[in-house]
Amino acid sequence: MRSVLICGGGVAACCCAHLLRRAGTHSIVEKVDRPRLPAIMLGQTTQKIFEDIFERGDLFEAGHRIQRRVVAWVEGREPVSLPHSAVVLSEEALLDRVEVGPAPNIEDMPGEPEWRIITSHSSAASSAEHHFGGRMAAASPVKLAPAARADSCWIESLPSGWLFLLPCGTDRGWLLAVGGPAQSLLAESHLVVDQLAELGRASGEFPSHPRITDPLGGPGWLRCGSAALGFDPLCGDGVGHAAREAILGSAVIRSVADGGDVDSLIHHYQAGLMAGFRRHLGVCSGFYRAGRRGPWWDEQVNDTLRGLEWTSQRLQTVDAPRYRLKGFALEALG
């Protein structure tokens, strides 16, 4: 295969480019400017995925460590403190660590690319999207209270939304407010509010409900990352999903280059992403059911149930898998 053009510039784009270059495929990233996430928390499983993709065990050595998770979720129950193991860093810092060497220029591409991988939501304007919810979120910089433990994170449900406080240093962090402005939600808070000394200005709102693009691929193109799926930050698995999508997408393109059937490989890719999206909706449904009762919470549950019904209908038409991942490559079954 001569070349692959990757339209994006985030985590999925970097993972796709690296995996394809490792396999000897000429890939070029056409970056799309978009705001970077100020803080992301990666659990041990996601850290291991990145270490395997980029063949580096030192990617997260300098990250801020989270060792405890304090949860006030079920109405009427006391907060629960649970052990945790995660690392916090900004999206920009993560990309700086995984982007090794200067990226090839698009002018260096030998003719038209044989495949395009679209990884940026802003570059997927012609796609049809299915949204399961309408909740908005906003992230605000904060200064932690002196008594707040910087190795902990906090999540709290409230009558019309929820708060997540994530330290990213000894005395600073980010507050994610979902369902309403941070100040309004903090006025009802009994847990998160006590961990704050100062609340900064939010950088703007963004959708926080699950969404999926349809179709996810066709001959000569695939959608990956935010151009394919959108995840609820409640589950904290968006970055890990982006890396997994990149693994599967790059494996599909490699299989096509080796003579595999294009239609069946694209079908496998779409089925894999659809199944992962359904699992995410199931987790969301469990979390929102376990939270509070009231109009806002009932709406979130109904939205996730609608998504589960839609994905069930779509997956009913999916054939049995014809491939499986072995490492970073697909192998045919049977």
Residue ranges of predicted features:
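Beta1/beta-strand and adjacent pyrophosphate-binding region of the FAD-binding site
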Residues: M1-A12
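Hydrophobic "anchor" residues on beta-strands that sit immediately upstream
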Residues: V4, H26, E114-R116, L222
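Glycine-rich FAD pyrophosphate-binding loop
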Residues: C7-G9, H18-I40
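Predominantly flavin-linked oxidoreductase catalytic cores and closely associated redox partners
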Residues: G9, V100-R201, P210-T213
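Short, well-ordered alpha-helices that flank and scaffold nucleotide-derived cofactor binding pockets
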Residues: H18, R22, V100, I155, ...
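Conserved N-terminal helical subregion
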Residues: T45-P141
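FAD/FMN-dependent oxidoreductases across multiple families
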Residues: P181-H267
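C-terminal helical "tail/cap" subdomain of flavin- and related membrane-associated enzymes
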Residues: R254-G334
